Regions:
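Conserved, mostly hydrophobic/aromatic
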Residues: 201
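Flexible, surface-exposed loop regions and adjacent strand-edge segments
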Residues: 237-242
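Surface-exposed extracellular loop regions of Gram-negative outer-membrane beta-barrel proteins
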Residues: 174-182, 346
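Short, proline-centered helix/strand-breaking motifs
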Residues: 25, 343-348
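Elongated, acidic membrane-bridging lipid-handling scaffolds
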Residues: 1-165, 171, 208, 224-231, ...
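Outer-membrane beta-barrel translocator domains and adjoining extracellular loop/strand segments
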Residues: 182-184, 235-236, 278
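Strand-loop-strand
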Residues: 186-189, 348
Length: 348
């Protein structure tokens, strides 16, 4: 009875509580993860939760994460519901992540990411209604280096800055550790060599909270600047005949359903080289100074024969100016694209 605070059974009531601890060192259930915390504190009076010098280490494959500070401020727990919780801000500062592979005695490879800054603002969770509200997500880090395709490529990003519904990536480079002439000999399927450099990528009005409720990502604007795509096909190496997927198939099969209101690409160059069977020097075809505007950039099918439209212009082989409109199908079941192009005089 909450009016009299009397009961025939055990009765417990509280308004606020707090706790603090030091030098925590123990395994999580299952003993696969070990957690060490130098200092921790929680207060519902002040509405904060703070952990200092946190390390999370996995028993297998040497996974390790550490950060000098994890804090949660402005914690709000409604009195009328145990299914709801909110907070003003979550901070994770200067996080370091590393993962090593190898045998019991030898580490063969280690990947790491340092200087991770993560923050969440104005979060409210209702477990009963299964709703999630988020004011802002902030993530900053630099010098990202991710292995791809079993180490035959690495994705390098000089800087990542996500805040206030905007994302910026600087100095993006997809690069292989093998030279373009030896790549196809090293790659098990003898695939073509690629190298892609991007000056920066910028997205605005990224609706992250909306994604959690609709499972669709809505982006206001996308800008891609200063792109150099290089490709070499080595005909000296025989390969099984195969169909090369079209570029738009990657958009259709993307793991995230998305819609981008406006998108553009500026200063885009392509260099295609092909080494013939009976030759020592590759031939070259190149496009430079290309600029393009997208409309209807999405992989969400809304009506039959729906297209993404790309209006572009640039130069072919350094002298032939061209304009083109490329219509790409949104629906994977409609396997047809349309291309309307015009090339001015070309003098080779």
């Amino acid at each position: 009875d909450e009016q009299t605070n009397r009961s025939g059974q055990l009765f417990f009531k509280y308004d606020h509580f707090g706790l603090s601890f030091r030098d925590f060192d123990n395994y999580l259930p299952g003993k696969d993860l070990r957690v060490t915390i130098r200092k921790g504190s929680l207060s519902t009076v002040n509405g904060f939760f703070r952990l200092q010098d946190v390390t999370l280490a996995a028993k297998k494959d040497s996974i390790r994460f550490s950060t000098p500070l994890i804090s949660l401020t402005g914690i709000r727990i409604p009195k009328n519901s145990i299914y709801q919780i909110g907070f003003d801000r979550f901070d994770l500062s200067d996080g370091d992540f590393s993962m090593s592979w190898g045998s019991d005695t030898t580490i063969l490879r280690t990947e790491s990411q340092k200087d991770i800054q993560l923050a969440l603002e104005n979060v409210f969770v209702d477990l009963k209604k299964k709703t999630f509200q988020l004011g802002d997500l902030q993530l900053q880090t630099k010098d990202i280096d991710i292995p791809l395709d079993n180490g035959f490529y690495r994705l390098k990003i000089g800087g990542l800055d996500l805040r206030e519904s905007g994302l910026r990536l600087d100095h993006v480079h997809l690069v292989s550790p093998y030279s373009k002439m030896e790549f196809a000999y090293k790659q098990p399927k003898h695939q073509d060599w690629f190298d892609v450099k991007v000056g920066n990528v910028r997205l605005t009005d990224v609706d992250i909270p909306g994604y959690f409720s609709t499972k669709e990502l809505h982006v206001g604007g996308l800008w891609i600047n200063d792109v150099l795509l290089q490709n070499l096909k080595n005909r000296k190496i025989p390969v099984e005949p195969h169909i090369v997927p079209m570029i738009y198939e990657g958009l259709q099969k993307a793991p995230v359903r998305f819609k981008i209101d406006t998108a553009s690409i500026a200063n885009f160059s392509v260099v295609y080289e092909e080494l013939p069977v009976k030759g020592d020097k590759p031939g070259k075809l190149y496009f430079t100074d290309m600029n393009g505007q997208f409309s209807g950039l999405t992989n969400i099918v809304s009506y039959p024969e729906q297209f993404i439209r790309l209006h572009a212009d640039g130069n072919l082989m350094g002298s032939g100016h061209f304009t083109a409109t490329w219509q790409l199908p949104v629906d994977s079941l409609y396997d047809r694209f349309l291309l309307d192009a015009r090339l001015d005089s070309l003098d080779l």
